[in-house]
Amino acid sequence: MSQLIDRRQNAGKKSTVNRQRFLRRYKSQIKKAVSEAVGKRSITEIDQGEQITIPAKDIYEPQFHRGHGGHIERVLPGNDNFIAGDRIKRPGGGGSGGAGGNASDSGEGEDNFVFELSREEFLELYFEDLELPDLVKKELARISTYKTVRAGVTTSGIPNNINVLRSMKQATGRRVALASPYKRRLKEAEEELERLKQLANPDKLDILKLERDIEFFKKKIQTVPFVDTIDLRYNHRVRVPSPSTQAVMFCVMDVSGSMDEAKKDIAKRFFILLYMFLTKNYEKIELVFIRHHTSAKEVNEEEFFYSRETGGTVVSSALELLNTIIEARYPPQAWNIYVAQASDGDNWNADSPYCQELLQEKIMPLLQYFAYIEIMPRHHQSLWEVYQQVKERYPNFAMENIDNVADIYPVFRELFKRKTV
């Protein structure tokens, strides 16, 4: 049996299949190295490839080889320094070994295996098993828009949908099926008539009968219509549900004076991961960036991550702007709306109850998911407490705490992990 090997997806490299097999085999070691690399990178370097090191012991494979026991005397080809019976000195440097490995007493060692992950491979491993949670509407498991698609042909329809080619094929087949018996009998009658006419004394009654039969068969053939109504075929189109993944993700970040550079760096890392994750997995997702201190404003991606503007803390300003943008541009009937907010938890005490009111009465009924991360290595403040009350009321509200850079990856996965059925 023949076997086809399709290498069109190998990007012009014959070793791609072997590389993919290697990545699958040592996936756990590679994913561990990837998660460690994320914590060491700056935001601008997060979407680059990575040099991965795998300890030699992890890629060791058992091998069959000759045993070292017994007594063997032999002289290998090409030897011009020794003869049988000579004693060879042990090589020096018995403590040599691989980089990062233990010393060897045999003069041999093995380095760790180092290779480069491409940007695509790095992101694929990093974002594996992640999915924007609950991409559903409130009423249905999936939002469905309908589109019209071809579904073959049918025997009924309107003239505009006539399939001429299929109709003519059907008519040809019908004419052949109906006329063939008469054509065969017509041919036999004509041959018999020709034979009788060549006789010296033919029977005139037989000739007359054959002539009548021939005329009858010709009329029967002519009465077969060229196209009949039963031949007509119409293009059949049906409406099928088309799942909608039209979503908008609001990224809300606190840039007030209480957010020091370390906290801002953690928040920026979280949002850049979120941004990369969304753009990698979903083509029809819009991102809206809102940064706030005492006032909030919608900004572009560059200003969201790198602007140095700062001030006090009024979280409700961001929530009010969020609600205004949703009402103006993203009707919940047409959009799946998600919000991710990063803050240190500091807020004007009198403002926190208003934030709770905004979320519970106006914003949460419009959303599919709200993810809140609080960058707070110490005790939580009033904002966390009111958000806890929102979480108890709305199951689509999630909140997690981040203490340092090392917590970003686990928290990110927890907030956006793929749910199993």
Curated annotation (Swiss-Prot):
Transmembrane segments: none annotated. InterPro entries: UPF0229 (IPR006698), vWFA_dom_sf (IPR036465). Residues 83-110 are annotated as: Disordered. Residues 91-101 have a biased composition (Gly residues). This is UPF0229 protein lpl2726. It comes from Legionella pneumophila (strain Lens). SUPFAM superfamilies: vWA-like. Belongs to the UPF0229 family.
